[in-house]
Curated annotation (Swiss-Prot):
A Gene Ontology molecular function term of the record: ligase activity, forming carbon-nitrogen bonds
Catalytic activity: 7-carboxy-7-deazaguanine + NH4(+) + ATP = 7-cyano-7-deazaguanine + ADP + phosphate + H2O + H(+)
KW Disulfide bond (keyword) present: no
UniProt-recorded name of the protein: 7-cyano-7-deazaguanine synthase
Gene name for this UniProt entry: queC
Length: 220
C-alpha cells in the first residue's frame, strides 16, 4: 500500500488522529476530509485543520449542515441534553452520519485519485451506534464500489480494539503525546484531556488510565 493514496475521514479527535498517523505509515500520500455539520463546537474543525497543517496533510472541509436540518441531535443542538438511556441510542447519535461521511469521502477520494478510505469507527466501543458496525462498513464498501464502478477499500484500523488499545496503537506509531495533547474528543470543546465529565471524556480517560497502567507494568 506504500505506493498508493488514501483519504482519511478526520474530525481532529483521538480516534481519527490515530487513524491519520496509521495512514501516514501505510500510504505514500494521504489527504484528510472533515465535515462541518453544525456540530456544537466549531473548534473541532479548527482543531482538525491545525493538526493537518502541522502534519503537512492536505485538508478539505465539506459543508454537511443539512444533517442538522434532517436529524437534530445533541451533537448539533445546544438545547438538547447529552443522554444515554439503557436500551436506547445515545442522544449524540446522528442518523445517517457515517453513511453520508463515507459516501462523500468516497466521491472526494475518486476525484483525487485515491481508492483507499480510512475511518476511525469502532465496534468495540460503539455505544450502540449502528453505523459503527463492521457489517455496515463492509456493506457500504460494496455499495460504493458498485455505485461508482471504482475499487474503493475502506480501512477501519480501530474496528476491533478498545480505547486502551487505541492509545497503545498511537504509542506504537510514535504519536502518543501528540494525540493526548492536541486532539479534541470532548463534547464540551476542551482540547487534550477534556472536561473529564462528558461521556466522550470518560471513555477516553478510562482507556488512557488502563493503557498507562499496562505500559507501566510492562516496563517494570
Amino acid at each position: 500500500m506504500k505506493k498508493e493514496k488514501a483519504v482519511v475521514v478526520f474530525s481532529g479527535g483521538q480516534d481519527s488522529t490515530t487513524c491519520l498517523f496509521w495512514a501516514i505509515e501505510q500510504f505514500a500520500e494521504v489527504e484528510a476530509v472533515t465535515f462541518n455539520y453544525n456540530q456544537r463546537h466549531k473548534l473541532e474543525i479548527d482543531c482538525a485543520a491545525e493538526i493537518a497543517k502541522e502534519l503537512g496533510i492536505k485538508h478539505t472541509v465539506l459543508d454537511m449542515s443539512l444533517l442538522n436540518q434532517l436529524a437534530p441531535n445533541a451533537l448539533t443542538r445546544t438545547d438538547m441534553e447529552i443522554t444515554h438511556e439503557e436500551g436506547e441510542l445515545p442522544s449524540t447519535f446522528v442518523d445517517g452520519r457515517n453513511l453520508l461521511f463515507l459516501s462523500f469521502a468516497a466521491v472526494l477520494a475518486k476525484q483525487v485519485g485515491a481508492r483507499h478510505i480510512v475511518t476511525g469507527v469502532c465496534e468495540t466501543d460503539f455505544s450502540g451506534y449502528p453505523d459503527c458496525r463492521d457489517v455496515f462498513v463492509k456493506s457500504l464498501n460494496v455499495t460504493l464500489n458498485l455505485s461508482m464502478d471504482y475499487p474503493f477499500v475502506i480501512h477501519t484500523p480501530l474496528m476491533w480494539i478498545n480505547k486502551a488499545e487505541t492509545w497503545k496503537l498511537s504509542d506504537e506509531l510514535g504519536a502518543f503525546e501528540f494525540v493526548r495533547e492536541k486532539t479534541l474528543t470532548c463534547y464540551n470543546g476542551i482540547i487534550g484531556d477534556g472536561c473529564g465529565e462528558c461521556p466522550a471524556c470518560q471513555l477516553r480517560k478510562a482507556g488512557l488510565d488502563t493503557y498507562l497502567q499496562e505500559r507501566e507494568g510492562a516496563n517494570n
